[in-house]
Amino acid sequence: MAFGIGQGRACASQKLKPKARFDLKIVSFFCLGVLLSGLGAANATGPDGNGAYATGSYRNLFAEAGHSQAEIQHKIDGAFQQLFHGNPTNETVYYPAGSNSNGPLAFITDIKHHDVRTEGLSYGMMIAVQLNKKPEFDALWNWSKTYLYVAETNHPSCGFFAWQARTNGVRMSQFVAPDGEEYYVTALYFAAHRWRNGAGIYNYKQQADELLSRMRHRAPITGSMPMPWRNTNVTVTAGPLFDEKHKMVLFSPSSERNRFTDPSYHLPAFYELWSRWGASEDSEFWKQAADTSRDFFVRVTHPVTGLNPNYANFDGSFVTTFGRSNTNFSYDAFRTAGNWSVDWSWWEKDVRERQLSDKLQAFFESAGTNYGCQFTLDGKQMEPRHAQGLVAVNAVASLAANDPRAKKFVEELWNTPTPDGLERYYEGLLYMMALLHCGGEFKVW
């Protein structure tokens, strides 16, 4: 998550000009990554690939494991009920928050850190549209637009969403975390297709089109932004959320941290959709961004373990400016395997994604049934907690895996209870989306 003012005039878009330890393997790691990435996307038979987008058929890993559709639906419904409408003290992450002129408001909160994040709001919207829960979707979107959308034309985050706020809507950061915008855009397109467009902020397609255009084209803006953790203001220049030259999503568009990326923000399955649904003049860019991310997955993952760091430079090398912990496989990095596996499931354009899932699952199988949740890239465990969110994403990796071991990861997810307590925000949302993916219910709408 990146560092990270009310509604008003829209921001202008302006197009820009076009088992040895890892330290013994670092040279071969990056050389192998560059070599493999040069192979390009493989085995696609047409522009729509061979996956669920082309066939309309989504794998149901739970059914393949022998569970009935009634059991699967019961598990999905139960998890949603608990996380969205359960006991507010120790179960739910979704909280109604009154209403305004646009209707009901609700937020999803990070229980552990007592805040609201675009990550969670946009994940919640995606879950809601997949499950046909329009009231929850609209309430989360209304809260996002009311409290986090930045409309001031002289603000460096203009046209995007401040990534973090208190539960009362007061912003804790004025910066942008692009993974939120990525999920907002895709969830809005799905809502437009599933429910049709309404008026104002509920004209889902218009909202998605405008946000997507800004994500590539918004002109740089320089302004003063508060940094509460430093008890000062700083002058920041920020522009679009994607690097035009490298065709990669940024960790943050702000000038002090826009020269690197977060592997878990790379969502080629979404970029393929944007190339079809967004502005025609941007279609080729999003197609290239999808292929770039597929290459990047190979470059940034360890050639033996399949693990990736939290952050990486555009060439896949380590980002060291935020401390050693972000060169390891940690919480952000949980999600990356899910991203390449869903890309394979929907598009089947790059067979290397299957190899990545096999490597990753082979590593976690070798780590034992109670593997931890933070590792160096060569596999040294840094934290022993067996995280439900990581269990969830490792099951999603089975969508791309070839090896029969994949069934073990699906069955572990099936036997894992819905997260509750202190860790239920991140773990719970990853778990909920994993149930949808593994149950064949996370679809292109």
Annotate each PLM feature.
Residues 1-22:
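N-terminal secretory signal peptides that target proteins for export/translocation
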Residues 27-38:
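Bacterial N-terminal signal peptides
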Residues 38-45:
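Bacterial Sec-dependent signal peptides at the C-terminal "C-region" and cleavage site
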Residues 45-85, 89-92, 114-118, 153-158, ...:
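Extended ligand-binding clefts on enzyme/binding-domain cores
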Residues 65, 75-120, 128-173:
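Internal amphipathic alpha-helical repeat/solenoid segments
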Residues 114-124, 170-196:
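Aromatic-rich carbohydrate-recognition surfaces in CAZymes
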Residues 125-132, 183-196, 269-276, 338-342, ...:
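Short glycine/serine- and small hydrophobic-enriched flexible loop segments
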Residues 379-445:
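C-terminal functional modules
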